[in-house]
Regions:
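Conserved anion/nucleotide-ligand pocket segment
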Residues: 1-22
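Glycine-/acidic-rich phosphate or pyrophosphate-binding loops and their flanking alpha/beta elements
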Residues: 1-3, 27-33
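Solvent-exposed alpha-helices and their adjacent loops that cap or buttress functional pockets
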Residues: 7-8, 15, 32-34, 64-65, ...
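Glycine-rich, charged/polar anion/phosphate-binding loops
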Residues: 9-10, 22-28, 55-58
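Structural motif
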Residues: 13-14, 38-40, 69-70, 101-104
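Buried hydrophobic positions in well-ordered alpha/beta secondary-structure cores of metabolic enzymes
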Residues: 23, 71, 121-124
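Internal helical hairpin/lid segments
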Residues: 30-83, 87
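ATP/nucleoside-binding phosphotransfer catalytic cores, i.e., glycine-rich phosphate-binding loops
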Residues: 78-136
């Protein structure tokens, strides 16, 4: 997949995550994985700004954004199709509040018929060249 870099230059770690809402169902259970040193992948089919803000704040309250090595934002179908403001990238940056956390955005991962696959649990390294907004 081709990511667009929002902030940071490199991320490396095991991929965890998936649908922003469904993955939160694991909170408080033995099935929620450790986030330490991981790359968190989040995407969503439905949900407006208020729902996304609620989900993102729950991840923040769980301490996730202080533990991960990077964040991949996939396609947020309803948010993007309806042109909600703030957009998902702005909302994430506002709620995460950590300018040192590497974040990328890609529409290649999500619920579309042409979506690409990311293997959960696989080690992933993403990086970019200086001044290049894309993967290097």
């Amino acid at each position: 997949f081709q990511p667009t870099w929002i902030q940071g230059k490199k991320m490396k770690g095991e991929v965890v995550g998936g649908n922003i809402r469904c993955f939160l169902k694991l909170a408080g259970t033995e099935y929620l994985p450790s986030f330490d040193g991981k790359i968190l992948l989040l995407e969503s089919y439905s949900g407006d700004v208020a729902k996304m803000a609620t989900y993102l704040n729950q991840y923040k309250q769980l301490g996730v954004f202080d533990q991960i090595n990077g964040l991949i934002l996939g396609h947020f179908t309803e948010m993007q199709q309806k042109g909600y403001e703030p957009d998902i990238v702005s909302l994430v940056q506002e709620i995460v509040g950590n300018q040192d956390l590497p974040i990328v955005k890609t529409d290649d991962i999500g619920h579309g018929p042409d979506s690409k696959c990311v293997i959960i649990g696989e080690l992933l390294t993403l990086g970019r060249e200086e001044g290049n907004g894309n993967e290097g």
